[in-house]
UniProtKB/Swiss-Prot annotation:
Pfam families given in the database record: Tryp_alpha_amyl
Protein's name according to its UniProt entry: 2S seed storage protein 4
Residue ranges annotated as propeptide in the record: 22-37, 73-88
Binding partners and assembly: The mature protein consists of a small and a large chain linked by disulfide bonds.
CDD domains cross-referenced by the UniProt entry: AAI_SS
Domain of life: Eukaryota
InterPro entries, sorted: Bifun_inhib/LTP/seed_sf, Bifunc_inhib/LTP/seed_store, Napin/2SS/CON
Keyword Ribosomal protein: no
Function statement: This is a 2S seed storage protein.
Cross-referenced SUPFAM superfamilies: Bifunctional inhibitor/lipid-transfer protein/seed storage 2S albumin
Protein family: Belongs to the 2S seed storage albumins family.
GO molecular function annotation: nutrient reservoir activity
Signal peptide start and end residues: 1-21
Length: 166
């Protein structure tokens, strides 16, 4: 009798464990399905950027950062000197608008869309000098940190190296 009772309890415990594992696996599979996209998250971000031209204020801010340093202003080296943006109300407002645009992006899309925005700035209008291209991409790289987007911080993309022709 004790053996039968033990077997029944063991069978019930096994059923309980299998049911629990099955439910857990279903939840994990559901989360994975929800997070994935048939075209992939990076391609989705690029497609959205191209369709809607996201981050217009960020592109304008990057353009201003590219020209910063001429005429005695601060330049972008390894860190940003934000004094000009704080003292100049127009630049401060533009940066705030850019940060607002970035906060509307999905965290997974922040860096890919910033890279697309930097690329758009780089190829708009005139041909830029290597130092200007570096400033564009450096501005894009650090924008999530400047805007205090904690899920992102600093974008991990490399700043393209442009050969100097002079």
């Amino acid at each position: 009798m004790a053996n039968k009772l033990f077997l029944v309890c063991a069978a019930l415990a096994l059923c309980f464990i299998l049911t629990n594992a099955s439910v857990y696996r279903t939840v994990v599979e559901f989360d994975e399905d929800d997070a994935s996209n048939p075209i992939g998250p990076i391609q989705k971000c690029q497609k959205e950027f191209q369709q809607d031209q996201h981050l217009r204020a960020c592109q304008r801010w990057m353009r201003k950062q590219m020209w910063q340093g001429r005429g005695g202003g601060p330049s972008l080296d390894d860190e940003f000197d934000m004094e000009d943006d704080i003292e100049n109300p127009q630049r401060r407002q533009l940066l705030q608008k850019c940060c607002s645009e970035l906060r509307q992006e999905e965290p997974v899309c922040v860096c890919p869309t910033l890279r697309q925005a930097a690329k758009a700035v780089r190829f708009q209008g005139q041909q830029h000098q290597p130092e200007q291209v570096r400033k564009i991409y450096q501005a894009a790289k650090y924008l999530p940190n400047i805007c205090k987007i904690q899920q992102v911080g600093v974008c991990p993309f490399q700043i393209p190296s442009i050969p100097s022709y002079y």
